[in-house]
């Protein structure tokens, strides 16, 4: 009975999953997932980042999502000229029901940045992301009627559900714009971005329906960080996303304090709120060129009324390096 229940939950889950992309609370930890124009959008030469999200841990249909990105500027540092071109790669794995439904995404990103003023305080970037997605369903741990034999279920027998594995890979194109502003002393930094994912609305196949299309995802992002008096800083983060009938606003605030003599060493606390879904306390540490963040989702939607409270957490890591002195 439990396996039958898992099967129907998997079907319902997959119908919802194919209509929308995975999402993160700490969206700014792996920024290529929300806007390809963030490629190379940092002071150092190279950035490597990762985010692991475990969602609905206490349910029969847990979801885990892992993303890894690497991006950097192209060419050699020149004090008289900025390097406008950046390249990056993004890998994402989305795993539902302990491997029953798995999606793998591999993407290549590129961006071009122009300076809008002589002081180089304002910049505009355009980004492009080309992605390839492969999905599969594995029902090796779930029994079907066709597998019933003398003495019980024999999982080595065909399950008769060939359509479940009939999922073709697809490719898609995404693009975005990003505006950056910083004051002369770099104590105030702001960005605002717009992006559209899956512009070509690729065709997907699920079960016997070959008319499933991945809808476009529209995203708006904004981040503001301000260095306050002495050793304190504060930040505000906003993300709005809309895909088909699913839309939400994610808002975050944070405050940090410097520790030690290096101004890059900080420890901070924050709070995220995703409309109609969850609120998340957030802890992060910056040490030299590395950053680590941990957030925990507290469900505020109707899902909180279940027999067991649904638990979700995220762990993010980021490292930047190889910045050459001018």
Question: What feature does the model see in each segment?
Answer:
Residues 2-10:
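Sec-dependent signal peptide recognition
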Residues 10-11, 284:
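Active-site/pore-lining binding-face segments in mid-to-C-terminal subdomains
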Residues 20-326:
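Subset of outer-membrane beta-barrel
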